[in-house]
Structures are given as C-alpha cells and as structure tokens.
C-alpha cells in the first residue's frame, strides 16, 4: 500500500483555478491604467532631470534655464580664417656653416674620444659617428678642403716619387 505516492501526485499536479470574468476585467483595467502612465513625468524637463551628474560639489541644484555666460556677438562680423603655416623645414645651411656645426658637435667629440681611448661603441652610436664623419668628408670635398694629415701624406708621397725617379736615372 502506497498512500504517500498517491498524495504526492495529487499535490504536484493541482489544477490552476480559473479566474472569474470580474477578476479578468479588473486586471484588464489595471493594465490599461499602467499603460496610460508610461512616459516621462510631467514637468521633468524643468524640474532638474539629471541630479547625479552635475551636483557632486554643489548643494543647490543648477537651474537648467541658465545657459552659457560667454558673450555672443549680435552683429555680422567677418569670419577670420586662419592660414595654416606649412611646417618649416630645417633651413639649408651653407656647407661652411654646416661643417662648422659638425666640427663643434660635443656628442661627436665625446664619442671620438671614447674611440681613441679604445672603448667600443654600441652599434647605434657607431653608425651615428660614421654618418657624421661621412657628412664631414662630403662637405670638405664640396669646399675643396682636405685634412692636414692628408696633405702631409701627399707631400711625403711626392717626395718619395721624386727620389725614386732620381735614383732610377
């Protein structure tokens, strides 16, 4: 005999009670009343709307009717158009001025001193030094200048050539 199983089945599957016509009418009226109330409350635009955004440091709510205090010109004025200045490129220096700048460059001098002392430079520093020295060579060739060391070597070579010629004859 299983009285518990028959009781549990009846409790679990209880029929839902049907609503009467009056209850259904009352629910319909309530739904209609709720539908009429949808939308914003009357006067919400002037009442302050966003109280959370602007009133952190102020106690009094700000009146939304008060606008900006910046003056607005009432007359017709000509519109000033700004002309965009093109970015000026580095001014072209004369070869002489550029050569002087490169010869007095402190960074280049410091790196050359480090090289003479036997230190090894990083790849970036070495490439920078090489580029600057190449530019100095180009400028000196444009100006027709040469290193003092080169002049002495050329003179030595000329003297050696002359000595060879004299000995050979």
Swiss-Prot record:
Keywords: GTPase activation, Ribosome biogenesis
Compositionally biased spans, kind Acidic residues: 147-159
A GO term for molecular function: GTPase activator activity
GO BP terms: ribosome biogenesis
Record's keyword annotation contains NADP: no
Residue ranges, annotated region (Disordered): 1-100, 144-169
Stored InterPro entries: YihI
Polar residues: bias regions: 49-58
Keyword Transport belongs to the record: no
Compositionally biased spans, kind Basic residues: 10-19, 31-40
Stretches with biased composition (Basic and acidic residues): 20-30, 160-169
Function comment: A GTPase-activating protein (GAP) that modifies Der/EngA GTPase function. May play a role in ribosome biogenesis.
Protein family per UniProt: Belongs to the YihI family.
Entries under HAMAP family matching the protein: GAP_YihI
Assembly and binders: Interacts with Der.
Name of this chain's protein: Der GTPase-activating protein YihI
Gene designation: yihI
């Amino acid at each position: 005999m299983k009285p518990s199983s028959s009781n549990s089945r009846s409790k679990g599957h209880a029929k839902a009670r049907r609503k009467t016509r009056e209850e259904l009418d009352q629910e319909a009226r309530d739904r209609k009343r709720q539908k009429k109330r949808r939308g914003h409350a009357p006067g919400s635009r002037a009442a302050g709307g966003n109280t959370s955004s602007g009133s952190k440091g102020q106690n009094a709510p700000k009146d939304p009717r008060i606008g900006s205090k910046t003056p607005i010109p009432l007359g017709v004025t000509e519109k000033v158009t700004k002309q965009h200045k093109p970015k000026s490129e580095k001014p072209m220096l004369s070869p002489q001025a550029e050569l002087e700048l490169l010869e007095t460059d402190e960074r280049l001098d410091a790196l050359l001193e480090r090289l003479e002392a036997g230190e090894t430079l990083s790849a970036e520093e070495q490439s920078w030094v090489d580029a600057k020295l190449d530019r100095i060579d180009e400028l000196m060739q444009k100006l027709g200048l040469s290193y003092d060391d080169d002049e002495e070597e050329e003179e030595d070579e000329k003297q050696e050539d002359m000595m060879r010629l004299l000995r050979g004859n």
